[in-house]
Amino acid sequence: MTRTLPPGLTATAVVAASSANLGPGFDSMGLAIGLYDEIVVETTESGLVVEVEGEGSGQVPLDGSHLVVRAIERGLRETGVSAPGLIVRCRNDIPHSRGLGSSAAAVVGGLAAANGLAAQTDSTLMSPERLVQVSSEFEGHPDNAAAAVLGGAVVAWTAAGAGDPRYAAAPIRLHPDIAIFAAVPQVRSSTAETRVLLPEHVRHTDARFNLSRAALLVVALTERPDLLMEATEDVLHQPQRAAAMPASAEYLAMLRRCGVPAVLSGAGPAVLALSTETELPAEALRYGADHGFAVKRMSVGHGVSWTSGVAVRT
């Protein structure tokens, strides 16, 4: 039985950006980054109001097709509650269409906000495992979604078998000596646009290469960061996407020539560097600035959080 929420309940969710793939871990590895979106939702008697500040303002829909709204509605169904009306306020710091998991953050944040509303009843809330499953259903793959839910670095997978896909993830401990740098350009790209550049089939030798590097990447991230250069090598998706984002491909190559383990962040065009140095080489910083990249050291992102309460009117 579905319970109708009364007007005046509020919930706030805070969700991190994320970087998927990390080189060889295509669709299976992710890392939460300390850049956050905030979603504030309030139940009302009727209607829908969507407000967006920051990234995406004036560009994303302000109706029921908004990804956050769709995720909230799915989350309410998951927890057995409904809301006659909603006010949804999104404060976005995660850049859109740059490969930093903005869509996963929208979905995970919306689901967490729904948990925050449902927590004010005796409903059963979505567990972290369920949040990974439902958010990955939106995304179609669990790497960004799992990182946004759990925080830190994750290995994610899709269980084999008949029926609907079952998604799961496990956190891995990131070595404390690893520093994270994000280089974000002004240009945009979509995962859908760059995914079509990938071949339907790959050579056995290429598959073997990436399997070895993905396995090595877990070792490098957790115990042996000195192996990150070799561990972040990839032949399955980054070379194929290079023509669609030449500036990012050149910056990635330039960083690696400087000895910096660098990868495309997700489908790009942002570039992620994982280094044991506290600063990038001066040459790399100059190149980034000259070619329109905003380069910044980032912290490791925490898992999605939510709070709930009652709206106060003044």
UniProtKB/Swiss-Prot annotation:
Protein encoded by which gene: thrB
Protein name as annotated: Homoserine kinase
Assigned EC number: 2.7.1.39
Record key words, sorted: Amino-acid biosynthesis, ATP-binding, Cytoplasm, Kinase, Nucleotide-binding, Threonine biosynthesis, Transferase
Organism name: Mycolicibacterium vanbaalenii (strain DSM 7251 / JCM 13017 / BCRC 16820 / KCTC 9966 / NRRL B-24157 / PYR-1) (Mycobacterium vanbaalenii)
GO cellular component term of the entry, any: cytoplasm
Residues engaged in binding ATP: P95, H96, S97, R98, G99, L100, G101, S102, S103, A104, A105
Catalysed reaction equations from the record: L-homoserine + ATP = O-phospho-L-homoserine + ADP + H(+)
Cited Gene3D superfamilies: 3.30.230.10, GHMP kinase, C-terminal domain
Function text: Catalyzes the ATP-dependent phosphorylation of L-homoserine to L-homoserine phosphate.
InterPro entries in the record: GHMP_kinase_C_dom, GHMP_kinase_C_sf, GHMP_kinase_N_dom, GHMP_knse_ATP-bd_CS, Homoserine_kinase, Ribosomal_Su5_D2-typ_SF, Ribsml_uS5_D2-typ_fold_subgr
Principal location: cytoplasm
Locations listed in the record: Cytoplasm
Enzyme class (EC, first level): transferase
